[in-house]
């Protein structure tokens, strides 16, 4: 199951006592700030969580899986996420007891 923005807003409503509209606006505003920073070419660093980086990928050869035809894959810019040490440690600790 995935965590949604609506669930995040609901959590803010329940834990901080914000009204639902304000909680939803806070979540939307948070993600809009991240989007705008990435669109303008900035790195996003969330201490204790991780970093969102932009990475330029060069054009490379590819293949159409249906026809087998060789086709070039265009150069593009992609967003990558690198989890921070604290996040990695918490996920590892949470998953170590599940096996």
Curated annotation (Swiss-Prot):
SUPFAM superfamilies: IHF-like DNA-binding proteins (SSF47729). Residues 49-71 are annotated as: Disordered. InterPro entries: Hist_DNA-bd (IPR000119), Histone-like_DNA-bd_CS (IPR020816), IHF-like_DNA-bd_dom_sf (IPR010992), IHF_alpha (IPR005684). Pfam families: Bac_DNA_binding. The keyword DNA-binding applies. Signal peptide: none annotated. This protein is one of the two subunits of integration host factor, a specific DNA-binding protein that functions in genetic recombination as well as in transcriptional and translational control. Heterodimer of an alpha and a beta chain. This is Integration host factor subunit alpha. It comes from Shewanella denitrificans (strain OS217 / ATCC BAA-1090 / DSM 15013). The lineage of its organism: Bacteria, Pseudomonadati, Pseudomonadota, Gammaproteobacteria, Alteromonadales.
């Amino acid at each position: 199951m995935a965590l949604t923005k609506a669930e995040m807003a609901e959590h803010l409503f329940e834990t901080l006592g914000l009204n639902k509209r304000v909680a939803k606006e806070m979540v939307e505003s948070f993600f809009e700030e991240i989007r705008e920073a990435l669109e303008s070419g900035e790195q996003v660093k969330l201490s204790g969580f991780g970093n969102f980086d932009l990475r330029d990928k060069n054009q490379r050869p590819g293949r159409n899986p249906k026809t087998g035809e060789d086709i070039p894959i265009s150069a593009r810019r992609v967003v990558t996420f690198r989890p921070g040490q604290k996040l990695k440690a918490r996920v590892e600790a949470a998953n170590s007891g599940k096996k």
